Amino acid sequence: MNKISVLQVGNEDLSLQLHIPDFVEWNYINDLRLAKERGYDVCVLNRCVNEKEARILLKKIRAYTLFLLDDVNVDQWTTWICTSRRAKVLDIRTLQEFVNDDIQLFFSYTYGEKYDPHSLSISQNFKGSVFWDGFNGVELEGDYGDDFYQVAYWRGNIPVFQGQTINFWLEYEKDDSVSIQLKIEQFQSGSLSSLQNRWIFTEEDLSSNVYVTNNNMDGPVFVSLLAKGKGKLKIVGLHDRHSRKSYGEFLPGGVRMVSSKREEVFMYFDPGDMKPPLNVYFSGYKTQEGFEGFNMMRKMGAPFLLVAESRLEGGAFYLGDDEYEKFITTGIQDCLNQLGFDRSQLILSGLSMGTFGALYNGCKLQPHAIIIGKPLASLGDIAVNERISRPGGFPTSLDVLVKNCGDMSQKSIDSLNHHFWDLFDQTDWSQTKFIVSYMLEDDYDMTAYNRLISHIDDVGVEIIGKGIHGRHNDDTYSIVAWFKTQFDETLKLDFKRGDLDEE
């Protein structure tokens, strides 16, 4: 188990009164000027802090990792840092219990993944029809019998270490006449016969995340799907994530929203110094699940919101039904409301797939600025380019087309393109500036930048662009460097903020 670094600030060293597990590194510091580590996983505060100390804590600890003991009578700056870091009040009488049971959930890394659909096998005993639909899932139809039996299983077991908790989330669709269960079995490492844990989850259990905690030896888990009844069953995807239980998704404080179609979107809000603007960053395509851009956005010092999703392979461009898309716009607006900001104090940003999230939701929110790198706008054209311009380069684009339009016809290609551009053309951009870096020979969406310019009809809209030679993924370093520089300039010039925090 990785070490958990704890910073305790107070007039006395509480570790002398506690039993500290081997995996906890307890750092008692009363003078915060002596806090040399770049950051800590958890902070326990049992005295008030002044302004200088509050500013140090802002740099040293992440939001949602500050715990204020309940016997502290808070003052102005203690209240300020507790608000910024989204502190929780902890009963001093339960501190030992917290150290024993919960502090291990504040590990510094994040990890999540979707089982590769190629690792999904259908049971040989199933005699019905099977239709494979890329990363959109596999559709089964037939008679599964009167009792639960294995209809599918995932090859490639994942390790679960002693004391570790793993979340599982199953995306599926089915007829009411079909019932399912998820079975997870754990074996001892190096053995396929020594079964040490078995969990069976019902449909009611599967309405939310299910998790397994390994209190035995290290060992891999094998996952299978059981079914009974008769009808259609679509297995969309199975996700496994290192769990923080009630403390958040991926990061402490991470929020997970799920639509009635079992589609997820994730958000992480850090209030920063609680001064404008609110910087929103949409994660790009990635197969390892979780939030992107945390360190980059945090160094800016301002409030920020990370948005991520894990549908298909690496993401589905934040497109969905009204319920799903409303999660995103409502989530952003809620953060603005918490801060007391309006949309003139909002910046939407992203790279590659994240640019579509920024542009698409920008149509609905009309922010102060949209800062993007490697823009992708015409999703239908991106799918078309998979055939000739970029064979095998981004097959997810084909899944996105089928997911939203049902097939890969020219009519569907045009429809997916128009879905974005029609909304873009109806938007009042008069109060928004666009800052865009793009690849001159982009093989994903080669017309995105020029079309953005040609579709902005509002007089006086500021557009700053920089073209870099290469295909879509040829020079990400230069794109990101310019992206950061322009973000810095926007914060300085438009919001009178200082240099980025280089801490």
Please give the residue ranges for each predicted region:
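Conserved alpha/beta-hydrolase
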Residues: G301-G314
